């Protein structure tokens, strides 16, 4: 039980560090690589890595094969969560073309607030203590990410990144709904397979690879 609690703290912390540090790289590439191209190129290696990891875990921890209904559930979960994730990262990358990494980091992290707000419409109860922590987190993110110059005005890029936060919130709610029904690693793999499947069509139409290179 103790190891489980430590894992619940350490793994999200590592994820937050990786996710937060990526904003600078995304911002630098935003003026050179289109949002769909960027999404495709970051999702393909992630999908391949997760697929290999799933294969290794299945070999190390054999289990019964999925039933037809479980396969449908995994497919449905991957499509729903993957579509939301595709839209979220596309809006985020598009917004970074016209806003700073600091503002994008703050606005994207507003999904922390939106998850419990939207969750109430799906029957999720939220305690007052959680709302207090959310308020403190948002205030901290604001002072960390937004300085006086960045805080002036609300640009088209800011709106795009806010839509990203909304989509991230729904994606997290969807993952929470399905994660108890399917394997979490397989769901992650399915999501990252969906991203290039959707993004490459728009990339080929609006952002041909020759213009990226």
Regions flagged by a language model, labelled:
Residues 73-80, 126-138, 157-161, 182-192:
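Cytoplasmic-side transmembrane-helix entry/capping segments in multi-pass membrane proteins
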Residues 22, 55-108, 143, 211-213:
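Specific transmembrane alpha-helical segments of multi-pass solute transporters/efflux pumps
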Residues 20, 44-48, 138, 169, ...:
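Small-residue-rich packing faces within the transmembrane alpha-helices of Major Facilitator Superfamily
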Residues 34-48, 93-111, 154-167, 213:
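Structural signature of hydrophobic alpha-helical transmembrane segments
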Residues 50, 126-147, 165-168, 199:
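Hydrophobic transmembrane alpha-helices of multi-pass small-molecule transport proteins
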Residues 29, 38, 42, 95, ...:
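Hydrophobic/aromatic residues within transmembrane alpha-helices
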Residues 1-37, 83, 91, 150-177, ...:
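Glycine-/small-residue-enriched transmembrane alpha-helix faces in small-molecule transporters
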């Amino acid at each position: 039980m103790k190891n489980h609690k430590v894992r619940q703290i350490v793994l999200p912390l590592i994820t937050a560090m990786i996710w937060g540090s990526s904003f600078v790289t995304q911002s630098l590439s935003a003026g050179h690589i289109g949002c769909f191209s960027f999404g495709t190129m970051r999702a393909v290696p992630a999908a391949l890595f997760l697929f290999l990891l799933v294969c290794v875990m299945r070999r190390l921890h054999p289990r019964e094969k999925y039933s037809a209904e479980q396969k449908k559930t995994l497919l449905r979960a991957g499509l729903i969560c993957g579509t939301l994730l595709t839209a979220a990262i596309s809006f985020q990358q598009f917004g970074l073309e016209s806003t700073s990494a600091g503002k994008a980091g703050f606005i994207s992290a507003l999904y922390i607030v939106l998850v419990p707000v939207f969750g109430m419409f799906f029957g999720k109860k939220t305690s007052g203590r959680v709302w207090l922590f959310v308020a403190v987190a948002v205030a901290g993110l604001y002072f960390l990410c937004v300085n006086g110059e960045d805080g002036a005005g609300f640009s088209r890029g800011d709106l795009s990144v806010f839509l990203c936060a909304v989509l991230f919130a729904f994606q997290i709610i969807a993952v929470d709904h399905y994660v108890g029904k399917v394997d979490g690693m397989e769901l992650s793999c399915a999501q990252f397979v969906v991203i290039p499947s959707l993004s490459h069509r728009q990339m080929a139409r609006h952002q041909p690879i020759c213009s990226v290179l």
